[in-house]
A protein has these predicted regions:
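Catalytic nucleophile serine of serine hydrolases
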Residues: 117
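Extended, subdomain-level signal for the structured scaffold at the beginning of enzyme domains
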Residues: 1-109, 113, 122-130, 141-181
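Anionic-ligand binding patches
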Residues: 134
């Protein structure tokens, strides 16, 4: 499977676990995994955690990792599947026309797509969520509905070529279902 490539869309402030877990898990399965970002550079990921006394998650600096390829350089036809992690990166990568082009290709070709946490922001901007069932970080329920999708509060939601999850605690179920596609 080393000739089968999977693309991960990331950027600064992507959630460390949501990038690195699928990256390493898919390499274990024998895939050639590439990380794409708005530009080819060292990315700065973050760690989101749930701590007592906070009304929402906290954010701390996470791992740094080199992007293998810039969005503009990506030929999505070279990849068999797509992973879109959460964190804050989807808030701004969704505004990148090449990011939207990449996402649209995977849905037009019915290739497997895994999204988690805040990733629906990027998929919604690409116009591919309408009519889909998807999980997301629960506070994104209004955004999911505004995109014409059905929000499902579950650890691994499968709808056609899309496998989605709420956040990093859902990783095992999320990747297990994605690998089946």
């Amino acid at each position: 499977m080393a000739d089968l490539k999977i693309l991960i869309l990331a950027g600064d402030a992507a959630e460390s676990l949501e990038v690195m877990y699928p990256y390493q898990r898919l390499i274990e399965e024998g895939y050639d995994v590439r990380i794409a970002a708005p530009t080819r550079k060292k990315l700065h990921f973050v760690v989101h955690d749930f701590e007592p006394g906070y009304d929402t998650y906290t954010e701390k600096p996470g791992y740094s990792w080199d992007a293998d390829i810039a969005f503009a350089e990506v030929n999505p036809a070279e990849y068999v599947a797509l992973v879109v992690p959460g964190g804050r990166a989807p808030e701004y990568i969704r505004n990148n026309a090449d990011c939207r082009r990449i996402v649209q290709h995977f849905f037009e070709q019915n290739k497997p797509v895994a999204q988690i946490c805040h990733a629906p922001l990027a998929l919604a901007a690409a116009g591919v969520l309408k009519g889909k069932k998807t999980a997301a970080y629960p506070q994104l329920e209004p955004d999911v509905k505004a995109a014409g999708a059905e929000f499902v509060n579950s650890e691994a939601v499968i709808d056609g070529n899309l496998v989605s999850a709420r956040a990093w605690p859902d990783h095992p179920a999320w990747m297990r279902e994605f690998i089946k596609l």
